């Protein structure tokens, strides 16, 4: 499995609402709608989505991007091309990880000129090229491309990684870095 890590710009400490916070931000109506739409598309009810948007605007970090917070539920959905894991946290925030469905891609017909994760096999070694792994926290999305190989259905290995991509609403990320955790895990942090 591949790891992705996103670190949010907001403080993990609650901020008293009676004092203006340096972490408070002003979101446009379009930004609020985009965040809310992302949250509700993954099953967060509208009222909870509005609550989370308000907390974000007032400088509160959501549980989904607070170090040490653990999800209270997780669901997984597989499609022909991807495996999507939605982790839900106590405050209602989510973390959605999307990686290629390697096994299904190996069985799918391959055509020339397609983009995204491409599969080929040579002897007992299976290769996936130009794959993408992404984590979406609604206000922050980040991920990277990578190549992957597997010999005899074991020894999975990420053979190349980068470039990365990201999108953030109401903030900025810096100091992007890759950390190789193991042969099969690479983490992108910011």
Language model regions located:
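C-terminal segment of classical bacterial N-terminal signal peptides
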Residues: 2-11
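Mature secreted bioactive peptide module from preproproteins
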Residues: 99-190
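Generic marker of residues within folded, mature protein domains
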Residues: 2, 73-77, 134-136
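N-terminal propeptides/leader regions of secreted preproproteins
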Residues: 12-119
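A generic structural signal for short, non-catalytic loop/turn and secondary-structure boundary residues
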Residues: 5, 78-80, 181
